Amino acid sequence: MKLTDLSNPAFLENPYPLYETLRAQAPFVSIGPNALMTGRYSLVDSLLHNRNMGKKYIESIRLRYGDTAADMPLFQAFSRMFITINPPAHTHLRGLVMQAFTGRESESMRPLAIDTAHQLIDNFEQKPSVDLVAEFAFPFPMQIICKMMDVDIGDAVTLGMAVSKIAKVLDPSPMSADELVHASTAYEELAQYFTKLIELRRTHPGTDLISMFLRAEEDGEKLTHDEIVSNVIMLLIAGYETTSNMIGNALIALHRHPEQLALLKSDLSLMPQAVSECLRYDGSVQFTMRAAMDDIEVEGELVPRGTVVFLMLGAANRDPAQFTHPDQLDITRKQGRLQSFGAGIHHCLGYRLALIELECALTTLFERLPHLRLAHLDALNWNQRSNLRGVNTLIVDLHAKN
């Protein structure tokens, strides 16, 4: 198996046959020099919780783009994000940012998520059909993030386009020269945008997310300006296409299992379980990477120091050793803990908000558009992102009669 398999068109359309092969081959499969991959749930879970597995972000940039690239403002910004750093810096920074994503803070966003869903549906409800990605799934999470930051909603489209360009930094394959230029330009634009906003919040603080960052303290230390800019951009990246793609993935999964869709529509109180099961069945985030900071032995297998391990979350979520009938969508499933948000110290900080957004988006869609039906279920246009699975378009008939 090779790393390039992750960019194969067949994999991008349906990664799960390759995942089945991966789990069956060996505990770990070599995919290159000092690089391993595993899709077994037990190994993924164990390594995510292992404190000797960490991040080597700048080293990975040098490996993919050369030594001088590590000094580029774009990559330096990513090196300040708490998703790319290790303790103790990670512990301090995550503790500060976490104050904005407690259970209480996340739950307080539910009315906003519901209102945003209704407002978007108002714009297209009377149409016979619509591209749900463009008209609902993409603007939905970005508008919520903008409102959380007290950013002009009119800027949401521009911010979303910039974030999509920057997010390619997180793909395992190097960007092309043109993509790198576009990503760098997009970062500079976002950095300037949020620098102005941060300075405004310093003199006129509010109850928004950026003001919370400025007020947040842990052991008397506040975030620096560069840390705030980097991590505000990180929150845009983490909370945008991961959620927007998952809305589409969930609708596709449910429509491919009509009995589950009918069950959910008959009892929308099942929505939290349905969202969790859709995340397990076909999550938008398919893998994460960790580096061995020391020699590690796990389940009798040695992972040498310096080895980069691709932890295939999508494969772990379909592991029959963890889930009964894993290739079946079952919205009443109570067995097993999904790996879609990772685990350990780098567990997704915004997972509660993501779950709330997905629950509100799907519930509101089914309440307002009970006859919604996907128009081209067998001819979907999957994106070309190995680690951000989703469709580019999703045409739906809004008032289809069965």
Curated annotation (Swiss-Prot):
Matching InterPro entries: Cyt_P450, Cyt_P450_B, Cyt_P450_CS, Cyt_P450_sf
Catalytic class of the enzyme: oxidoreductase
CDD domains: CYP164-like
EC number, as in UniProt: 1.14.-.-
GO molecular function: heme binding; iron ion binding; monooxygenase activity; oxidoreductase activity, acting on paired donors, with incorporation or reduction of molecular oxygen
Pfam families in the record: p450
Cofactor: heme
Alphabetical keyword list: Heme, Iron, Metal-binding, Monooxygenase, Oxidoreductase
Residues reported to bind heme: C348
Family from the record: Belongs to the cytochrome P450 family.
Stated name of the protein: Putative cytochrome P450 133B1
Species name: Xylella fastidiosa (strain Temecula1 / ATCC 700964)
